[in-house]
Amino acid sequence: MQPMFTSPKPETKLLPGFTSELHHFVFQSFLTFPKRTQTETNFHSPLNQNLPSIPFIPAAMAGAETDTDTSKAKPRPIVRLGIFLISHSFFFSVVFSAAGVLALLLLPVLAKNTYISENSLMPGSVAPMLSDQEVAEANRLIDDLTALNSKPLGSVIGSRRLVAQYMSNSGAEVSFHKFHPQINQFHPLHFFSSPDSRRIEQNVSCALHGVNTVGIIRAPRGDGKEAIVLVTPFNSAKVNKNEALSLGIAYSVFSLLTRVPWLAKDVIWLVADSQFGEYAAVSAWLRDYHTPLFSGLGTIDAEMCPESNNLHGMEENHFTERMTYDGFKRAGTMAAALVVKVGDRAHQYEDSLSIYAEASNGQMPNLDLINTVNYLAVHRQGLRVKVEKLRSFLDMGWLETLGEMFELLGHYARSINPQLKFGIPAAEYIEGSATLASSLYYQALGVPTGPHGAFRDYQVDAITVEILPKVYTLGNRRQNDFLLRSGRLIEGVVQSVNNLLEKFHQSFFLYLLTSPSKFVSVGVYMIAFVLLVAPLPMVAASLFVNASNSDDSLNTEKPAPSATAADSAPLVTAYESSPLLSAANSSSLATTAGCITLSSWKWLYAAKKSFVVYLWGSVVSLLPYFICQIPNCTPTTSFIIWVLLSILSLVVMYMILASPFSDANNSRSQKEWAILKSVTMSAAFIGLCLMSIINFATAEIGGLLIVPMCLMAYPLKLDVKTRSLRTISRAACNLVLGIVGFPPVTFIVLKGAFEGYSSISVGDFWSWVESLWVWNSATYLYIGVVHLPSWVLCIHILFHHC
């Protein structure tokens, strides 16, 4: 058929100020004009001289042209990529999950050497000034403290008075800080309270109090706006040899700093009374330091316990009496803090130094602080620096095999290109894996590994250094050498922090340690987490589209998918029959997607089930608050009561909010379990992502447990009905994952693997959970609000009626 018009189509130009939609509307309106006698019609009126020349085309032909242009329109690349991933969700879920686990195992290989980012620190740039004179003064303090142990009467006040006297003799300002131990009891609002919130205990006994001794050196070159804190915990009731040594080390440095001319920041020496715990003493002092009370509590307290408020009555030394103050003394903003301890265990070969850095909820100090201590200890004082590691990892055969494989791959890579630095020795890989696992564990636990954790609540970078002598019993000469090396290390750290012009900010705050001199930054370890959780949204979208497509087929009286297709994989995918894929090849993408959303309201029932279960998880998390009110309750009894109340609360919620396991109106849907699984995976994905912001280590370990359980969840009834090797294997894997994924079972398995199964009891899980809520660890909320509900929903999918 010959075309109606042979004249070429003129180029269409948009009018100035016209949008494309308005121009299209004008063009369509023109097409509806009555038929003219001429073959072409143009506007030639004076008012339309600037309009383009538009040929007259019949409406039918114009409609055909419009459909052709629309059919050629393709979705955006990001939409096409999403459709492609959803259509192949089974393949990509396997690839991404395996890649996530592999990336986690590769972290020790990908670790980088530490370096100091802040140039102003300049560790080791100045020769140490600590001499034998300061060491001799420290030895006198150690001897005096040791002699007090033979005097049971008055030794508590005597040790405090002695330390205060030495501080005052060095020229520092001395004050005492009295505190009462707080009762650690579960309370749901404590998870959302700031560290400066306090409770005033009623009927406080004078016997239950501690007294911190505080000495402050005012910097001759400073303005009093910044300070460096040294902390030495000691038990005033019974000072042992190690505590006396730690006090001697700190005093040798403190007495030196009172005479140096270069000090630009105030120095605070906190002798923390650790008879109620090291953390409690430091936390109480920090709380009062940052949140002063303007009330009469101090007067009331002095009247209640007058003997504890006359600690500085030293008649024999008028200079000491003049330099001791009753009020709470303060210095400037804390730039950094260092907790100094002498370890109980002796090292066999050489003096060593252990660094503890983990604070509450996985918070870490700036990496520059650890690097400074490590550099000065290794390169200036010849100390062997160690960080904690999980000893059980050192004896794992599969880890050794994996390390040998990475070592061979490294040799092969260097044979191809000598510049490639992939691969490390197998022994180094095992050590790095054990250290990395320890770093992940303690960060995920959310419990501080020392009194330094109290400083992170106030955004102060702090670590605990535990110095371990080569032999436990030190002679005079050996003790002098030990005090000199340890004191010069602390002096070097103070010098470096004193050089800072601003707070630590150059280096990393989010990292994992594989050794004292190697770390994995957040940009590297987040790759493993992203790869691990990436299958959850893909498979959730695939399940939802597939289930909606099946429901649409049933509603239009089309044959339902075959049983073979339904049982082909636990991750239901739809590539050839997916509405999204067909929409990508046609002009009805938005229309088709809209129909799926509007016609598939079945997900609301699954959302209701998930909401009820997650609400139940929140109730379970609050039950320990009431269980703690029961007097004389053992951990085993408390755990049993917790389990019974959890089951009872689920039954009550079933009666009030309707059963989360009821069919409702979904009896016609053959893919109800798929929609429920889709909602479960979406909720688990959101929970893991939110937890990664609060505590990455908890999210990583939780993802290793939840992601396989969510991906593999499939009704056992369908697997048993098919009775093939693949379905039976899948059912067995689901049962194993379901058992191991239950939080108490997970705890028992991990504790048995690391410590042995001989001493495990049912009440151990309650004791572990109790330690989490006492320290306000977000891991406790994760277990109750994210992990437990996801586990219950996966178990429901396994036993779905289908």
Which sequence ranges carry the predicted segments?
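Intrinsically disordered, low-complexity basic segments at termini and long loops, enriched
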Residues: M1-A59
